[in-house]
Structure formats: C-alpha cells, structure tokens
C-alpha cells in the first residue's frame, strides 16, 4: 500500500498543474455547498427565533401569515386595528398572564417605529427565550423617549441623547414628519439578529401624542398642538395593531384561542407563533432548496472535471500503466492506483474548500450581520455539513474508478508500443 501511495503521489505531482485546477474546482464546489448549507441553517434558526416565549399573537381577523409578518417582522400593514377595549378584555381573561400591545404605522428613516408598553422589555423573548438587553442607556420612561435597535443605532450612528423625529407612514412612503414633537434616544438594544434590531421603540402614549391633531391618517388643517401641551390630553390608546399574549398555563392555549376567535366585541384572530413561522418558512424556504441545488450542480461539474482530467491523462500515462501491468499489476492494482489519486485530489479539494468556507464566514459574518441581520457563527460542522463532505469524498472516489476501468481495457501491447 505504501508503494502504491508513493506511485500515486509521484504521478499526481508529475501532473500537478492540471490536477491543481481540479483541486480548486472541487474546493470551490465544497465552499459553495458548505456556505449555502451554513447560511440556510443559520437563516432558519434566526427566522425561527424571531419570537419565543409568546403563546399567542392577537390581531384583527386576517391571514395568519399576514398577522405574523406585520406584528413580528414589520412587513406589510394591518387591514384593521384592534380596539383598546379588546386589549383590556384580553388582559382580564382568567387564562391570560400578560399582554403586550403593539402599535405600528410610523417610521424613522426607513426603519419601523413600534409603540408598546414597558412590559415589552421584560416579556418579549427571542431565540432560546432570551430577554432583550440594552447595549447602553435604559428603557423609555418619559413621554418622548425612544429606544432604538442595534442596527438602527449602527447604521445611523445614534447614541443615547440623540434627538430624532418620526414620520407618519411606513418604510420610505412617509406622508409627513412629526418634526414638532422630537424624541430623545434613551437606550440602544443589544443585537438580537431579529427585526427588533431594525426597530425604533416608543411608548403607546407617545404614539397617541404625535397623532393628536391627525384624523383619518392625515393632519387636520390649521390645528397644531405643541409638544409641551400634549400631556393635557388623554393619551390612552384608542386602538393598537396587535398584541403579544402570554398564558398562565400553556395547555389552555387552544381554549383561549377559541375564545378570541368567537369574541363578540369585534372580529379577532389569534395565531400560535411557532405554527405560523413554520407555515411562512414553507413558502419562503423554496429559495434555499434552489440554492442548494445550484451548489450540488457545481459539485457535479467539478467531479465531472475530475473524471475528464483523469481520462484525458490516460493517453499520456499509457506507458506508465502498461509498465505496471507488465510487472504483474492486475485490475485491482490499476483501479486502486487511480482511485487513490482521485481520493487524494478530492480530499485536498474538500480540505481547501473547508478552509475557504471558514475564512468566508469569518470575513463576511460582520458584513452579513450589518447588512441583513444574519448572524453566522464559526461553530463545529453540523450533521448535514459532515454528510455533504462525506458525499463529496465518496463521489470523488467513485468518479476516479471510471477512468481506471477504461485504463485496464487498453491492451498491454498498445501501451508498450511507441507511437510516431
């Protein structure tokens, strides 16, 4: 075996420039496969961890996916709001432990503004039921206090004490700015890898205060209420967009859900976050399969390149293989020699691809986190990643057997006879 390995190594070294291209091709396919698999895994984990520890999300009757999108991911808009009376009825339900109202509709320089209660900072959880943490500052307490997510602070360069103004309307479609009622940033949340990072948080009373002179989504002509006078008005919310609900006993979730769906005050619906997240992922997860398929095709092309390189080199190696057969090498030895060469090339390619993937994660992770909120960790390979690497190694070894069979079929005389 040692002699066979020595022959295989010397033969490969003799054709090192050609094989180097094959090694790089396999490394590239390994890099793509592992990269896509890691992004797919982390993306799904980040997606599934957007909200946890919440038993129900309640909103106006609509589709479960739509309710999840605007209440958790700040995407889209609610068809209707729910009245404050309904929120109070939820809070009074004997099976409900806590309720965190959510009010959306405004924005700040493209980032969503979420009005909520201070319970949001102690009740909302993400990931493995992790609580929100402040990177600096404190939760909002005064009327015009604001707490911004990590991505908002990093992209806009905000720190505690920064003055900001909010705009009516979501995203870039701002109707008008509430320039007469500026907010002060009092806290910056630690990064979570969830939509919280891209959100400006204010109190429910503050949302009412900046819309006192607004009716039907537009400011009343000639009416202006200065910021210092808004406290004279009743700032209790009239309605909210949705509410996060925690139960005293999770076993009662379907009973409370049924009570909400039959609530007579107004048409409401309640969704289980985990179920709704799975439904949404089944729709948007098609893209990950397409990426994985493309990477697999790249790997297939690389392996085809390995076969073609070895096949093309057979003509150059006719004499080498013929000499081996002349000294007693059988089919088993020829196959073993070429299979060993193929395995060496594949192993080198896979190892180089793993190194490239690790370097890629280390270098691109900060950029992906800053641009897309996607956190990639330099953790040990997952089971799927081990299986992908093993599949590449086996496929490379099998691909090298095809030229071996072809090589043995060449006649001994053909290999030993000189060609002019």
Give the positions of each predicted feature.
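Short helix-loop junctions at transmembrane helix boundaries
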Residues: 351-391, 401-414
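Transmembrane alpha-helical interface segments in multi-pass membrane proteins
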Residues: 296-301, 311-313, 318-365, 387, ...
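N-terminal Sec/SRP start-transfer signal
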Residues: 1-34, 339, 420
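Mechanotransmission and gating elements of multispan inner-membrane complexes involved in transport
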Residues: 177-184, 188-288
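Internal alpha-helical transmembrane segments of multipass membrane proteins
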Residues: 24, 289-309
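Hydrophobic, regular-secondary-structure patches
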Residues: 33-122, 138-142, 232, 256, ...
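Short helix-to-coil transition segments within interhelical loops
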Residues: 12, 325-332, 410, 419-420
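Hydrophobic secondary-structure segments that place a key small or acidic residue at a functional site
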Residues: 107-118, 127-219
């Amino acid at each position: 075996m040692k002699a066979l390995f020595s022959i295989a190594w010397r033969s490969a070294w003799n054709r090192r420039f050609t094989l180097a291209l094959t090694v790089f091709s396999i490394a590239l396919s390994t890099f793509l496969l592992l990269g896509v698999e890691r992004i797919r895994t982390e993306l799904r984990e980040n997606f599934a961890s957007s909200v946890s520890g919440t038993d129900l999300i309640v909103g106006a009757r609509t589709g479960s996916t739509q309710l999840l999108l605007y209440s958790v991911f700040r995407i889209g808009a609610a068809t209707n709001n729910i009245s404050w009376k309904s929120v109070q009825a939820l809070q009074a339900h004997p099976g409900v432990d806590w309720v965190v109202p959510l009010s959306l509709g405004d924005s700040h320089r493209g980032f969503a503004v979420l009005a909520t209660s201070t319970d949001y900072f102690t009740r909302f959880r993400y990931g493995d039921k992790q609580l929100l943490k402040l990177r600096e500052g404190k939760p909002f307490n005064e009327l015009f206090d604001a707490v911004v997510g990590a991505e908002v602070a990093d992209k806009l360069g905000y720190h505690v004490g920064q003055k900001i103004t909010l705009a009516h309307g979501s995203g870039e479609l701002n109707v008008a700015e509430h320039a007469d009622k500026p907010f002060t940033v009092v806290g910056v949340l630690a990064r979570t890898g969830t939509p919280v990072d891209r959100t400006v948080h204010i109190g429910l009373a503050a949302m009412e205060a900046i819309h006192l002179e607004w009716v039907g989504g537009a400011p009343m002509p000639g009416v202006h209420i200065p910021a210092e006078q808004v406290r004279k008005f009743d700032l209790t919310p009239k309605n909210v967009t949705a509410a996060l609900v925690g139960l005293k006993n999770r076993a009662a979730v379907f009973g409370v859900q049924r009570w909400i769906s039959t609530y007579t005050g107004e048409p409401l619906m309640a969704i289980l976050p985990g179920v709704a997240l799975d439904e949404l992922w089944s729709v948007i997860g098609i893209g990950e399969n397409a990426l994985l398929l493309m990477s697999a095709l790249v790997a297939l092309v690389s392996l085809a390149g390995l076969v073609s390189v070895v096949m093309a080199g057979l003509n150059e190696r006719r004499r080498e293989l013929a000499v081996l057969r002349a000294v007693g090498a059988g089919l088993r030895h020829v196959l073993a020699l070429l299979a060993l060469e193929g395995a060496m090339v594949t192993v080198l390619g896979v190892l180089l691809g793993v190194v490239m993937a690790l370097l890629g994660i280390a270098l691109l992770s900060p950029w992906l986190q800053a641009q897309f909120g996607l956190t990639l960790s330099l953790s040990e390979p997952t089971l799927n990643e081990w299986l992908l690497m093993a599949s590449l190694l086996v496929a490379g070894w099998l691909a090298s057997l095809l030229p071996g069979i072809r090589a043995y079929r060449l006649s001994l005389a053909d290999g030993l006879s000189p060609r002019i």
